[in-house]
UniProtKB/Swiss-Prot annotation:
GO terms for molecular function: RNA polymerase II cis-regulatory region sequence-specific DNA binding; transcription coregulator activity. Component of the Mediator complex, a coactivator involved in the regulated transcription of nearly all RNA polymerase II-dependent genes. Mediator functions as a bridge to convey information from gene-specific regulatory proteins to the basal RNA polymerase II transcription machinery. Mediator is recruited to promoters by direct interactions with regulatory proteins and serves as a scaffold for the assembly of a functional preinitiation complex with RNA polymerase II and the general transcription factors. One of its GO terms (cellular component) is core mediator complex. Keywords: Activator, Coiled coil, Nucleus, Transcription, Transcription regulation. It is found in: Nucleus. InterPro entries: Mediatior_Med8_fun/met (IPR019364). GO terms for biological process: regulation of transcription by RNA polymerase II. It comes from Debaryomyces hansenii (strain ATCC 36239 / CBS 767 / BCRC 21394 / JCM 1990 / NBRC 0083 / IGC 2968). Belongs to the Mediator complex subunit 8 family. Its main location: nucleus. Component of the Mediator complex. This is Mediator of RNA polymerase II transcription subunit 8. Residues 170-204 form a coiled coil.
Length: 225
């Protein structure tokens, strides 16, 4: 079963970590309920698979037994749903590990180390050192979230005051329309054409190499045009 690490979004002191607001009992209840559902489904699956492997020796449970097992499952799922709804805000700020994709079988030793409740001695020293260095500092996660939301709102307000029609500023657009820019563009085209002709002479069969933009498009989109 995955281990649960809760990140409290209230103001906390790094020197005195307050875990009183973490509903440990509720989280433990959710974990136990999930484990019960897992065991119930596992039992039902084993009964069906055992019958499939030995159809002449083992009979499937009767209808009443199936109904009772499903009723137990529904009750367990209802309880889990209720617990999840009651702790919705907390679970939004909760990190669950390891991820489902973690190779638990191949990395059994590592997973045991990761899920141990007591920190390693060197980790204890690191924690104590960090607390000593920042004992007079405070972390306000909620204030950081409010600042991030303010930045997003401000950006949206500023964006409404501008109209975007491209990647060039007004000064750059004026320069693009000037005679100097037109001459520079023509010179760049001549240089590019000269490079293209030189590549035709170098490459086998007289074929030119791919333009960097086409290479990047193929790498990002898998399209070669």
């Amino acid at each position: 079963m995955n281990s649960i690490h809760s990140a409290n979004s209230n103001t906390v002191s790094t020197s005195e970590i307050n875990t009183s607001q973490i509903p440990t009992d509720s989280l433990e209840s959710i974990r136990n309920r999930l484990n019960q559902v897992h065991l119930s489904l596992r039992k039902l699956s084993d009964q069906i698979n055992h019958h499939n492997r030995h159809p002449n020796k083992v009979k499937l449970p009767n209808y009443a037994q199936f109904q009772n097992q499903f009723q137990v499952l529904l009750t367990q799922l209802h309880t889990i749903t209720s617990d999840l709804e009651n702790n919705d805000e907390l679970l939004k700020n909760t990190n669950v590990y390891p991820l489902p994709s973690f190779p638990t079988t191949q990395q059994e030793g590592l997973i045991t180390t990761l899920l141990r409740k007591k920190p390693l001695p060197e980790v204890d020293e690191w924690i104590e050192s960090a607390i000593d260095k920042r004992k007079n500092e405070y972390v306000n996660v909620q204030k950081d979230d409010e600042f991030a939301q303010w930045c997003l709102t401000k950006i949206e307000e500023l964006r409404e005051d501008f109209q975007f029609y491209g990647f060039n500023s007004v000064e750059e657009l004026k320069y693009l329309d000037s005679e100097d820019e037109k001459k520079e563009t023509e010179e760049n085209k001549k240089i590019e054409n000269q490079k293209y002709e030189e590549e035709l002479k170098i490459t086998a069969g007289g074929k030119s190499g791919l333009h960097p933009n086409r290479v990047l498009k193929f790498m990002c989109q898998g399209v070669l045009t």
